[in-house]
């Protein structure tokens, strides 16, 4: 009986071995260099920001990428730039992936493949001192700021068309900024009544400037956040999908979700290209 059990276990190991090796296979250049270059847009806590004391990049995305890199035996090297620069950086081959608050949405999928790893969506926020803005429809006819190159301008327009225009109210005026800090500055200066950012950023947004902000209404969109890879790089995509599964299975993903207060964004299905249009 013992020999039968051993034989069964050996057969199972042989069946699993090709999958494991294949799952961790890396493109030849990365296998040789042990370096994966990732596009990054800092200033979007809690996903990626710079520690004010050390200037080091920290955040959920940084920790999760490091955990996956450890599984694959590689090192992540970041190229920090504006949000709208990330897409051309990946398309031109200057980086190997994007993992920086990047939504998996249909209009991006003709160019990229996504590994989904967080629930996400858009949320209005404003200053606590904006007493005349009590509900989201108070933004009809007012200016709202958000990130350039994101899906939020489209989400705001859809929401405005349904909740403002159809109700006979003037539409929301959308302006865009190159990064989150600029959006906050525009609101503080009174050039915009509110902003739209991700659900994942709301806890840290509300705490900024001595808890000077508040979320406004319900989320205006829902989708999934993903790591983006070029369509011609399925080997690297599959390697990171394997690594993410391992990090979820061993509990490190849950630990990082708790550390960065992203419980409402947890997503453990490791799906490919499944984000709905926000």
Report each predicted region and the residues it spans:
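Ligand-binding cleft/hinge of the Venus flytrap
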Residues: 66-72, 152-176, 206-210
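Alpha-to-beta junction loops
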Residues: 36-37, 74-75, 92-100, 142-143, ...
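A ligand-binding cleft/hinge motif common to bilobed small-molecule-binding domains
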Residues: 84-88, 102-110, 154-160, 186-221
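Extended ligand-binding regions for polar small-molecule ligands
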Residues: 62-71, 130, 137-151, 226-265
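Periplasmic-binding protein-like
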Residues: 42, 118-126, 207-245, 262-278
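Acidic, polar ligand-binding/catalytic clefts
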Residues: 66, 70, 75-138, 276-277
């Amino acid at each position: 009986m013992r020999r039968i059990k051993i034989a069964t276990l050996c057969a199972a190991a042989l069946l699993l071995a090709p999958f494991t090796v294949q799952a961790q296979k890396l493109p030849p250049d990365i296998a040789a260099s042990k370096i994966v270059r990732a596009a990054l847009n800092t200033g979007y806590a809690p996903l990626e920001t710079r520690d004010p004391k050390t200037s080091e990049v920290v955040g959920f995305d940084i920790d999760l990428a490091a955990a996956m890199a450890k599984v694959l035996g590689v090192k992540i090297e970041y190229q920090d730039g504006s949000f709208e620069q990330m897409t051309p950086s990946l398309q031109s081959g200057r980086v190997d992936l994007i993992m920086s608050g990047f939504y998996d949405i249909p209009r991006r999928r003709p160019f990229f493949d996504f590994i989904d790893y967080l629930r996400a969506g858009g949320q209005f926020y404003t200053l606590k001192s904006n007493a005349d803005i009590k509900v989201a429809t108070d933004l009809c006819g007012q200016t709202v700021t958000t990130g350039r190159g994101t899906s939020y301008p489209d989400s705001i327009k859809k929401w405005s068309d349904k909740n403002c225009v159809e109700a006979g109210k003037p539409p929301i005026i959308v302006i865009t900024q190159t990064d989150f800090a600029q959006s906050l500055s525009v609101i503080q200066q009174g050039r915009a009544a509110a902003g739209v950012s991700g659900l994942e950023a709301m806890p840290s947004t509300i705490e900024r400037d001595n808890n000077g902000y508040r979320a406004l209404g319900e989320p205006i969109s829902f989708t999934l956040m993903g790591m983006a890879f070029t369509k011609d790089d399925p080997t690297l995509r599959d390697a990171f999908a394997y690594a993410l599964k391992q990090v979820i299975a061993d509990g490190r993903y849950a630990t990082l979700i708790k550390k960065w207060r992203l419980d409402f964004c947890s997503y453990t299905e490791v799906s490919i290209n499944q984000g709905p249009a926000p």
